[in-house]
Design a protein with these regions (language model features):
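Adenylate-forming
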Residues: 1-85, 92-94, 99-104
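AMP-dependent adenylate-forming
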Residues: 55-58, 73-197
């Protein structure tokens, strides 16, 4: 009897896409924790429709910080196109946003690179000093002592409620005719279309 699921978002989406709940709705699940990519609200809402009393927890974290550094307990309804918050840092982690000049971002609705530090941070990439030197760097906000941090390459922002939210990947930016375009914004717009699952 399974009471807790810790699954990749893609696994949860397979169940909702293939109408798995029409076949069977699990009886004993109390908690569902998911990570690996941004959870499409459309799919989360399908799960919540069939399992409304379950605690849903969005977990974020790259492998370089031992996979988990933030969590968000879903505490309200979300509409398609809304962004599910990433939540707050685990007690032994630091999670913060830096702008292109390595200045701390605290204001709302401004994208910055998500950076992480803490006791679970990896030491670098095995036999890859060049990549390690690019991604694992001294925290520019700390000039007092050695504090390595990891540049995730993820862009995030604080929403109107002050919650940390994933925007897109830094390497998903393209320039077209001098304009910076976030491919993640196109993906988010498509998520609002009910016919696209």
């Amino acid at each position: 009897e399974v009471t807790t699921l810790v699954w990749a978002v893609s696994a949860l989406c397979i169940i909702s896409t293939l109408n798995g709940f029409e076949y069977k709705v699990p009886d004993n699940i109390k908690k569902i924790l998911f990570s690996g990519e941004a959870m499409p609200v459309k799919h989360l809402n399908i799960w919540r429709k069939y399992l409304p009393d379950v605690m849903y927890v969005n977990i974020y974290g790259p492998t370089e910080i031992t996979c988990n550094c933030t969590y968000y307990i879903v505490d309200r309804e979300f509409q398609p196109g809304d962004v599910l918050p990433m939540g707050k840092a685990f007690p032994n982690e630091k999670v913060f946003l830096l702008d292109e000049e390595d200045k701390l971002i605290t204001e709302r609705n401004k994208n910055g690179e998500l950076c992480v530090a803490g006791s679970a941070l990896a030491l670098g990439y095995y036999k890859n000093r060049e990549q390690t030197a690019k991604a694992f760097v001294q925290n520019p906000l700390n000039d007092r002592y050695l504090e390595p941090m990891y540049r995730t390459g993820d862009l995030a922002y604080y929403n109107e409620l002050g919650e940390l939210c994933f925007a897109t990947r830094k390497d998903f930016q393209i320039k077209h005719m001098g304009h910076r375009i976030e491919l993640g914004e196109i993906e988010a717009a498509m998520d609002k279309v009910p016919e696209i699952v």
